[in-house]
Amino acid sequence: MFFHLIVTDDCNLCCSYCRAKMFEEEDPAGHSPGTIDETICENLNFPLADLYTFLEKDKDAVLTFIGGEPLLRTDKILEIMDHAPIKRFMLQTNGTLLAKLPTEYTNQLETILISIDGDKDLTDKHRGEGIYDMVISTAQTIRKNGYNGELIARMTIAEDTDIFSAVTHLANYFTSIHWQMDADFTGDFSHRRFAVWSKEYNAGIRKLVSEWVSRIERTGAVPKWYPFLSTTEDLLLERSSKLRCGSGYANYSIMTNGWIAPCPIMVGMADYYAGHIKGADPAHLPEIPIGEPCLSCDIYGFCGGRCLYSNIVRPWRDEYQLVCDTIRNLHDALIENLPRIQKMLDEGTLSMDAFSHTRYNGCEIIP
């Protein structure tokens, strides 16, 4: 089982997609999030012995440190890595403090997801001046210091993102890239130009899929561009998927008070809790399933539902369909290029092993 551990809700940045939205007026959501847990605290606030007892029941557990910015509590991270009865750790970080993490701990991390949105202008516009240079420098430093795990550029994209340019730029520095659209997570649709931009995005995705396949044809290696990687593997194997991030059945989030939510975005949504670390068995957590209208969609087996939180709360109400249109475009673009990949497989210049990757590692897969 995979677990996100929210080490702290505090953060040292105020990115436009995240904390800056606290100051914006929101449109009413389509549905209520239900009962709100008011015992959530800013920092991890339960005995670590309870966490270790919980994890001990699943020797194959994977623990991902998230926040806020988890490295604001490096002390807790080091303590947990020293004493938790598991061997697999991951980290999601904005990169500002990563260079200060002791090398021997950095190099134990199986995967590091580091936030960066594209080139310098785009990243600094949304995350703060100097962030791009800091992230690129930090990524290079940890590699020089012996980090051999997977380093994933984790992008957030919005209306000023040219998806083709942003991804191909980052491909100069990262072999693994994931992007998530800032869409249908808060009630901000009325002051967005998403409907217009999504047409540009869809065209960019079609161009980017073709570029991805061209790179495979030239090199025989599959770039780990996650929205293409996992989905293409399943299309080739004719395999369907539930929610691709794993939330609510393979991937759960441990909040600062010890309660277990199906997803990091669903912090405090008490009606959807899967238990508490004090008494829960990680091997027998209840599944929190996706609901309609996703289940009746003809490409549900490809998409899996995109986002459990959005499916429940409907921040964009009926306009969620615009997001669905981008997913259908992704599906169609991959299907269109699948014969090129199948040809390489048939000729023996490419093997299915080239698509190997870790699922549920913090990449939502469906943007």
Language model regions located:
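Canonical Radical SAM [4Fe-4S] cluster-binding loop centered on the CxxxCxxC motif
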Residues: 1-46
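Cysteine-centered iron-sulfur cluster-binding motifs in ferredoxin-type domains/subunits
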Residues: 6-14, 69, 248, 294, ...
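Short, solvent-exposed loop/turn segments at secondary-structure junctions
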Residues: 10-12, 70-71, 96-97, 119, ...
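Residue-level signal for well-ordered alpha-helical positions
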Residues: 18, 125-126, 266, 310
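Radical SAM enzyme [4Fe-4S]-AdoMet core and its adjacent flexible, acidic
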Residues: 27-35, 46, 129-136, 140, ...
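A short acidic, glycine-rich active-site loop
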Residues: 37-42, 124, 282-285
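Radical SAM/AdoMet-radical enzyme domain recognition
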Residues: 48-64, 73-184, 194-196
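Flexible mid-to-C-terminal extensions adjoining Fe-S/redox cofactors in radical SAM and related proteins
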Residues: 265-367
